[in-house]
Design a protein with these regions (language model features):
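N-terminal hydrophobic or amphipathic helices/low-complexity stretches enriched
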Residues: 1-32
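N-terminal capping segment at the start of a domain
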Residues: 29-45, 190
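Generic beta-sheet signal
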Residues: 79-81, 154-158, 185, 249-257
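Cofactor-binding active-site loop characterized by glycine-rich and histidine/acidic residues
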Residues: 36-39, 51-179
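Thiamine diphosphate
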Residues: 127, 131-246
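Glycine/aspartate-rich loop-and-adjacent alpha/beta segment that forms the canonical ThDP
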Residues: 2-5, 233, 239-291
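Short, active-site-adjacent cap segments at secondary-structure transitions
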Residues: 90, 165-166, 194-195, 259-263
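Histidine-centered active-site/metal-ligand motif
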Residues: 47, 87, 118-120, 137, ...
């Protein structure tokens, strides 16, 4: 059954590019990282590493790629974005607040009376398209959205973690998306190469490794694969634009990131800071690094 959308007469902006270029994105990324670190320190800790690795991906998507309108967060013709790695919600909140989806203070994050819960809630936070956090489910939901929106115009973007890609549901969904030829579905994998409990050792490698041959695996499931550096703004923009080219199959961007990017303390100990707190001295040093 094809869904018919009512034309509201309003236009969804093509993107929110202010013309500042890569230097402008770098400046905003630093400010977003300060927001993330300050918010997590205020509540006594949280997912520093994965939030800092994914924020550049979200920044380029929202500022240079997504067709969305913060003034009309439920516009039927908007692009959809699902942060499947919902434990990095603080990064999404920081980005949405900067886009003016809401003005609730980030300091309320994960507190009892705040709408900014530890994982995104689509019923409470403007701009959140799916309540995520149970790893492995986001792509399945994205497929449903892409099927409903096929031929209408909007694109569906799903942000996965590379650790999350060990969930079997991801690959069941990947197989279905390819079979349905969903070229309005785009996956971005935050390949920061670390997860909370480490990677399961493979028979060929004595040391823990991520899902081996990630690009080959996605190709084997029928996806178009793009690989890029996850903190190179021009490279990310090029990859996201390439993903929009109709090919009759879904596209995945494997973005090579650094867990804790921008904060040397976290980058040096990514396992510790998957979900952790920092003391006052460490926090002061982090804020100095991000000054």
């Amino acid at each position: 059954m094809k869904i018919e959308y009512i034309d509201t007469g309003s236009v969804v902006p093509a993107c929110h590019d202010d013309g500042s270029g890569a230097s402008g994105l770098a400046l905003e990324a630093r400010e977003l990282r300060r927001d993330i670190v300050t918010t997590l320190h205020h509540v006594g800790g949280g997912h520093y590493g994965g939030s800092l690795s994914v924020i550049d991906l979200l920044l380029v998507l929202y500022r240079r790629c997504l067709r969305v309108d913060p003034a009309q967060p439920r516009h039927p013709l908007r692009d959809r974005l699902i942060l499947s790695k919902g434990h990095a919600a603080v990064a999404l909140y920081a980005m949405l607040r900067r886009m003016r989806y809401f003005d609730a203070p980030l300091a309320g994050y994960a507190s009892f009376d705040s709408v900014l819960e530890g994982h995104p809630d689509m019923t409470r936070v403007p701009g959140v398209d799916f309540s995520s956090g149970s790893l492995g489910q986001g792509l399945s939901v994205g497929i449903g959205m892409a099927l409903a929106l096929r031929g209408v115009g909007p694109a569906v973007w799903v942000v996965l973690g590379d650790g999350e890609c060990q969930e079997g549901q991801v690959w069941e969904a990947a197989m279905l998306a390819a079979a349905c030829k969903l070229d309005n579905l785009h996956v971005v994998v935050d390949c920061n190469r670390f997860q909370e409990w480490g990677w399961a050792p493979t028979a060929a490698e004595p040391h823990p490794l991520p899902v081996p041959d990630m690009a080959d695996k996605w190709r084997a499931f029928g996806w178009h694969v793009i690989q890029c550096a996850g903190h190179d703004y021009d490279g990310l923009l090029s990859a996201f634009q390439d993903a929009r080219v109709p090919r009759g199959r879904p596209c995945v961007i494997l973005a090579q990131t650094s867990k804790g990017k921008g904060v040397p303390l976290v980058e040096a100990a990514p396992w510790r800071f998957h979900c952790e707190t920092v003391n006052s001295t460490e926090h002061a040093q982090i804020m100095e690094d991000l000054a």
